[in-house]
Amino acid sequence: MLKRFSRVLAASARLAGSLAGMAHADQPVINFGIISTESSQNLKSIWEPFLKDMSQQTGYQVKAFFAPDYAGIIQGMRFDKVDIAWYGNKAAMEAVDRAHGEIFAQTVAASGAPGYWSLLIANKDSKIDSLEDMLANAKSLTFGNGDPNSTSGYLVPGYYVFAKNNVDPVKAFKRTLNSSHEVNALAVANKQVDVATFNTEGMERLELTQPEKPRQLKVIWKSPLIPGDPLVWRNNLSDEQKNKLRDFFFKYGANAEQKKVLADLQWSKFQPSDDDQLLPIRQLELFKQRTDVANNANLGAEEKAAKLKALDEELAKLEKRMAEREQKTAANAG
C-alpha cells in the first residue's frame, strides 16, 4: 500500500511539474533589454528580483536580454527581439529613431536627484588634475572613451570636452579605447588607462560592488546635469501589453520590499515620460555636429555654409519645441 501511494505521489509530482512547465511555456514572453554598463554577472544579480516581480505581476514570462554593447540592445529592438529596454538617453534616441522604440517612463535616482552627471576620471596618483591638464598632455595619455551610444560616456563629453575645445580624441591622445563604464573605471584604478569617461551613477555603483576601487580614482571634470535614463518599449506592442507594463511600472515601489529592489538598482519610483525627454539630447547632438562642421578644414566654403544652415534650421525647430514644452509644463504646474 505504501509503495503504491509513493508511486501515485511521484506520478502526481511529475504531472504537476509537467503542467507547471506547460503553463510557463504558454505564458507570453517579454524580452527586457539591459544595457551593458558593467559585467553581465553583476547586472543579472541586481536585475533578477525586479524582473521576477515583473513576471509575477504582469503574467508575462520576462526574460533578460543582455548584449556586449548598447548597439546590440538597439538592434534587438529593431528586429523585435527586445520588447522593452532600459537605455541611456543617447541609446534611447537611436532606438526611437531606428528601432521603432517609444519612451514611456523615466528612472528617478534613489537620492531624488533629477538626473546624473558625466565624469572624466584619472588615477589618484596621476599628475593630471583637470580638463586643461588632460588636453595639454593628451599626446602622452591613453584615453578610455565610452560606448558610442552612451550619453555620459560618449555624447556629453564628446561635446563639452572635445567639440567645444576643437579636439578630436582619436587624434589627440596617444591611444583611445572604447569600453563600458565599469571597464573604464577599473582600467583607470589599475593604471592601465590614464583618463576615462565615467558617470556619477557608475561611481555610486562601484562604491557598492568594489569599494576599494573608487578610492583609487579622482574626478577631473564634471558635466552639466543629464536627464534620468528612459525606459523604452516597442511602439508596436499591443495596447494590452502596454497597459499591463505601464500599470506595473508606475505602481512598483509601493512597499518596503519593492523599494529595496529599486534601491539596489539605485532608483526610486518611476515617473511617466515620453519621447520629448530626448529634446535636450537631440540639441546636444546637433550642437556637436555643428561644431564638427564649423571646424572641418576639408569642407569648401559653400558646402560648409549649406551644412551649417541646415543644422541651424534643425536647431531652431528644436528650440521652438523645447520652448513650447516648457510653457506647457509651467501651465500644468500652475
Question: Which ranges hold each PLM region?
Answer:
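An extracytoplasmic/periplasmic, membrane-proximal ligand-sensing/linker region
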Residues: 38-39, 45-49, 244-334
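Periplasmic-binding protein-like
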Residues: 31-36, 43, 109-119, 211-246, ...
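Immediate post-signal peptide segment of exported/extracytoplasmic ligand-binding proteins
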Residues: 22-34, 135-142, 315-334
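Bilobed "Venus flytrap"/periplasmic-binding protein-like clamshell domains
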Residues: 27-55, 67, 90, 117-186, ...
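Pocket-flanking alpha-helical
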Residues: 65-102, 202-208
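Short helices/loops that flank or line small-molecule/ion binding pockets
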Residues: 71-85, 98, 116, 181-196
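A ligand-binding cleft/hinge motif common to bilobed small-molecule-binding domains
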Residues: 89-99, 162-163, 189-190, 194-215, ...
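Bacterial N-terminal signal peptides that target proteins for export
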Residues: 1-10
